[in-house]
Amino acid sequence: MDRFLVKGAVGSLKRRMEQEQTGGGPAGLAEEEGNSKKNPRRAAPGNGVDSAGLTWGRIRAEGLNCDYTILFGKAEADEIFQELEKEVEYFTGALARVQVFGKWHSVPRKQATYGDTGLTYTFSGLTLSPKPWIPVLERVRDRVSLVTGQTFNFVLINRYKDGQDHIGEHRDDERELALGSPIASVSFGACRDFVFRHKDSRGKHPSRRLEVVRLQLAHGSLLMMNHPTNTHWYHSLPVRKKVLAPRVNLTFRKILPTTKRTTLLTASASVGSFALHS
């Protein structure tokens, strides 16, 4: 049986925020959130309120360590969403395609990267140089840093035009990531299901059967994926044909500059312990 953890763990905070705001959200958002037919089977354990007044849902399982909150009130989230739609420049051409088993396919979503000058990052076999930060991304990044105490120098942006766009099971375990650093996932637009599956529970004949953990990532929400989550758990955003509205997701990361990465690779290779991931 799947373990269904929805945003209800911080629902009371979200409702208070929305009562203070006026106006509607992105087209289709309220309908998608309000008319969901899925009921929570278990609330997120260990919830608490931090010094900034944010209510956090603590999501824990074997090797799974995540924290979830509503970071932006509705009006501010709407404003940021509209700015992202206007300002972000997404990949085109070859960068919008991916090679799988020798065949090239269009990526089922739009992608972009922004970050500090001089960084490179490998994603799905592509080595990317991020675009310079723009104000709307700095605004979100700085808010995340303020409430978490973490710093980030890179962001990967995924835009899902509707529920047909998706991303398959994967782990964010690229060698460029600073060892043990968290990934901050901020969502704007349509509420979408987000699924965690343990590495030992994948495939037709898994070695173990651990519960799948399902979340619903709301407009303006922050999901902190802390170490060692990406070591043990794959995550995905599955197809949801009934979702008609777009979603934009920002995943803030801390990646190593090329010089430090080369030093780490050389040192690790000398003891035969470095494994490459793409």
Curated annotation (Swiss-Prot):
Its main location: nucleus. Its cofactor is Fe(2+). 2-oxoglutarate binds at N158, Y160, H170, H235, R247, T251, R253. Interacts with PCNA homotrimer; this interaction is enhanced during the S-phase of the cell cycle. Interacts with nucleolar proteins NCL, UBTF and NPM1. Interacts with XRCC5-XRCC6 heterodimer. One of its GO terms (biological process) is DNA alkylation repair. A motif (PCNA-binding) lies at residues 3-7. Coiled coil: none annotated. Binds 1 Fe(2+) ion per subunit. Dioxygenase that repairs alkylated nucleic acid bases by direct reversal oxidative dealkylation. Can process both double-stranded (ds) and single-stranded (ss) DNA substrates, with a strong preference for dsDNA. Uses molecular oxygen, 2-oxoglutarate and iron as cofactors to oxidize the alkyl groups that are subsequently released as aldehydes, regenerating the undamaged bases. Probes the base pair stability, locates a weakened base pair and flips the damaged base to accommodate the lesion in its active site for efficient catalysis. It comes from the Eukaryota. Fe cation binds at H170, D172, H235. It is an enzyme of class 1 (oxidoreductase). This is DNA oxidative demethylase ALKBH2. Pfam families: 2OG-FeII_Oxy_2. Its EC number is 1.14.11.33. GO terms for cellular component: nucleolus; nucleoplasm. Activated by ascorbate and magnesium ions. GO terms for molecular function: broad specificity oxidative DNA demethylase activity; cytosine C-5 DNA demethylase activity; ferrous iron binding; rDNA binding. It comes from Bos taurus. Substrate binds at F101, G102, K103, Y121, T122, F123, D173. Belongs to the alkB family. Keywords: Dioxygenase, DNA damage, DNA repair, Iron, Magnesium, Metal-binding, Nucleus, Oxidoreductase. Residues 151-256 form the Fe2OG dioxygenase domain.
